[in-house]
Design a protein with these regions (language model features):
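Conserved AMP-binding/adenylate-forming
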Residues: 315, 354, 371, 405-407, ...
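Conserved AMP-binding/adenylation subdomain of ANL enzymes
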Residues: 304-324, 334-376, 391
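Single conserved hydrophobic/aromatic residue that forms the stacking wall/gate
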Residues: 1-14
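Structural core segment of the AMP-binding/adenylate-forming
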Residues: 169, 173-263, 381-382
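AMP-binding/adenylate-forming catalytic domain of the ANL superfamily
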Residues: 240, 584, 616-641, 655-681
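AMP-binding/adenylate-forming catalytic core of the ANL superfamily
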Residues: 181-207, 221, 371, 378, ...
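Conserved pre-ATP/AMP-binding loop-to-beta segment of ANL
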Residues: 110-112, 235-241, 246, 252-287, ...
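Conserved AMP-binding/adenylate-forming core of the ANL superfamily
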Residues: 49, 96-97, 114-169, 186-191, ...
């Protein structure tokens, strides 16, 4: 977690005053409510109740908004308590058709569908729905010409370039199952995912821009293919997108195809008919981050995912026809799938896609994009917010952000100070904030504010979305112990009772892992792996992953709370807390913190003050035994702290930090730096 030193001292005092009470409620303006899709909590509760008690009627009504080649015979069939779920049984549709053709049929052919901003400022492209359909069909026909067919699994190892959503939609159009692998992953991580899904075809690029540097993506793709071959999987075809001009990469003649040349062939038609997909046909496989363990391939299917992403986008972002939507996620993660590509396009929206990082060439790149494209809805991660908080406020003030009407947060709980900074400096205290909680397994948002219906509490994910019934359960200590719901404000394990259309159907090729990982910890419930509590207003507060709980002398403590306390000190920019073995307590707390560059106090004085803050805010039991000052955290290329590495350092298991852990880091050298300065045992 991070905090800012960039805001004025006056604003810092305001933040602390405003966040002393965790139940502060911030309501949307009357003007916002009057134009919102859902305008009261009572209306929300009526809709939510119907979605739980009568899901067939609720979701069946929404599904009528789509084009179906054949109508469904049953809305839902299954046993949610064991993860056996089918939606829109017997129906046939195509998500690409509904993203593009159906929008054109509704009169949106000349509306801008995709605004692409490359890292070079001049590299800006606008695609209407007509344009996008033409590009998608040509890509689809090129893939079909080269042997890609319905049911084939195809890996997309592409960065944030406009061809990525085009190829995704092309796969969906012809029934191929796409597996997007984050462009920042190493060859080893890419090969792991290719082997896991058995993909024999890949789309990659010759290179891309990252912070002013040309990155050779093809080299990683070639190495991954070699690793797959060594493991017994031969990659038959690699299709190469020429992103970089005058950037030569080697081609393997028997395997590689330059898509740019294929697309110029006369035989590649501008139209490709959409495959009639069964509602439960696979759409994509999305692998979880490689930061921990072997990758898990969540399998999402066609119709349920389509209906759910459409609905969450419409209501959570209160989408209107003239909105410009900017989600800063990478499409290599589920947020980019659902809220850069599928959710916006299914609603006929204009979606913004940016190639690179928020701080290049200057720390105002996001604010510049918002100003340039007149963005109305901005959706980003707390990690990004906290990083930009640490920049001078002038980078925001030089841009016009007045078109913004709604802000969103995704990826992790947002600490209250970051929430207030985001609201004040980006939203000018007039934009509601939707703090969304969900997972790769979910397909779309599960808990969030509905911005016109009820207010936000800084740090709380708020209330469940339609079709989602969360409960907080006490931990079970034995296999035959029944599930017990936690009391109000009592921390426990966040589980889900019901099924919703977007839920993954299984882990690809690993049905037992699917069952054991999600349905055995609390039998009869979907186990999210997150801790939470529910307050007296029904709002849910996410306390972090269950494995981020440390047991000190029999007391279970969530590290997120301790990080929040450390961040309340004005000299701390970022904090990460992990457990390490202690011969008396069982475990103790090890805090890694980054100092504000403008801090004048000595490290020893700050260390004492930090312990005092934690003692005051949480209690003596939560005071970290060790506090180490670091220059940078070990983060993967999506900006998330890899806590597994910090645990190894804290536990003095440095020799167990494998190359596969280090390969996913944006700055691998930081590991040695932190390890060399590890605080030893006295």
């Amino acid at each position: 977690l991070m905090r800012s030193s960039a805001a004025s001292d006056v604003y810092k005092r305001q933040v602390f005053t405003m966040t002393e009470k965790r139940d502060d409620l911030y309501l949307p303006s009357r003007e916002f409510v009057e134009q919102a899709h859902i305008q009261s909590r009572a209306e929300y509760e009526r809709m939510w109740k119907q979605s739980i008690e009568d899901p067939d009627t609720f979701w069946g009504y929404i599904a009528k908004d789509f084009h179906w080649f054949k109508p469904w015979t049953q809305v839902y069939r299954g046993e949610p308590e064991i993860g056996d779920n089918e939606w829109f049984v017997g129906g046939k549709t195509n998500i690409c058709y509904n993203c593009l053709d159906a929008q054109i049929e509704k009169g949106r052919g000349d509306k801008v569908a995709l605004l692409f901003q490359g890292e070079p400022e001049a590299d800006c492209k606008r695609f209407t729905y007509n344009d996008l359909l033409k590009h998608v069909c040509r890509f689809a026909n090129a893939l079909k010409k080269n042997g890609v067919k319905k049911g084939d699994r195809i890996v997309l190892y592409l960065p944030m370039i406009w061809q990525l959503p085009v190829v995704m939609l092309a796969c969906a159009r012809i029934g191929a199952v796409h597996t997007v692998v984050f462009g920042g992953f190493s060859a080893e991580a890419l090969a792991d995912r290719m082997l896991a899904c058995g993909a024999k075809k890949m789309v990659t690029t010759n290179g891309y821009w990252r912070s002013g540097q040309k990155i050779n993506a093809k080299a990683n793709a070639d190495k991954a293919c070699m690793l797959c071959a060594n493991a017994g999987l031969t990659i038959d075809d690699v299709f190469v997108v020429d992103r970089m001009v005058d950037f030569e990469v080697p081609y393997i003649t028997y395997r590689d195809t330059a898509l740019s040349k294929e697309l110029m062939l006369d035989e590649i038609s501008d139209y490709c008919p959409a495959e009639k997909m069964d509602a439960e046909d696979p759409l994509f496989i999305m692998y979880t981050s490689g930061s921990t363990g072997s990758p898990k391939g969540t399998l999402h299917t066609t119709a349920g995912y389509m209906v759910y992403t459409y609905t969450t986008f419409k209501y959570i972002f209160d989408y209107k026809e003239d909105d410009i939507f900017f989600c800063t996620a990478d499409i290599g993660w589920i947020t980019g799938h659902s809220y850069i590509v599928y959710g916006p396009l299914l609603n006929g929206a204009t979606t913004v896609m940016y190639e690179s990082v928020p701080t290049y060439p200057e720390p105002d790149r996001f604010w510049h994009i918002i100003d340039k494209f007149k963005v109305t809805i901005f959706y980003t991660a707390p990690t990004v917010i906290r990083a930009l908080m640490n920049q001078d406020i002038q980078w925001i003030e030089k841009h016009d952000l007045s078109t913004l009407r709604l802000l969103g947060s995704v990826g992790e709980p947002i600490n209250p100070e970051a929430w207030h900074w985001y609201s004040h400096y980006v939203g000018h205290d007039r934009c509601p904030i939707v703090d969304t909680w969900w997972q790769t397994e979910a397909g779309g948002v599960l808990i969030s504010t509905i911005p016109g219906a009820f207010g936000s509490k800084p740090g709380s994910a708020a209330l469940p979305f339609f079709g989602v019934k969360p409960v907080v359960l006490r931990s079970r200590t034995s296999g035959d112990e029944p599930a017990v719901e936690a009391d109000v404000n009592e921390k426990g394990e966040l589980c889900l009772v019901s099924a919703w259309p977007g839920i993954m159907r299984t882990l690809y090729g690993e049905p037992e892992r699917h069952q054991n990982g999600y349905y055995t910890q609390q039998p009869g419930y979907f186990f999210t792996g997150d801790g939470a509590y529910k307050d007296e207003d029904g709002y849910f507060w996410i306390t972090g992953r269950i494995d981020d709980v440390v047991n000190i002398s029999g007391h279970r403590l969530g590290t997120v709370e301790i990080e929040d306390a450390l961040l309340s000190h004005p000299a701390i920019v970022e904090a990460a807390v992990v457990g390490y073995p202690h011969k008396v307590k069982g475990e103790d707390l090890y805090a890694f913190v980054i100092l504000d560059k403008n801090s004048k106090e000595s490290e020893e004085d700050i260390r004492k003050e930090l312990k005092a803050v934690v003692r005051s805010d949480i209690g003596p039991i939560a005071v970290p035994g060790k506090i180490q000052f670091v220059r940078e955290m070990p983060k993967n290329r999506s900006g998330k702290v890899v806590r597994r590495i910090l645990r190894k350092i804290a536990s003095n298991e440095i020799d167990e930090i494998s190359d596969s852990m280090i390969n996913i880091l944006a700055e691998p050298g930081v590991v040695d730096e932190i390890a060399q300065n590890r605080i030893g045992d006295k």
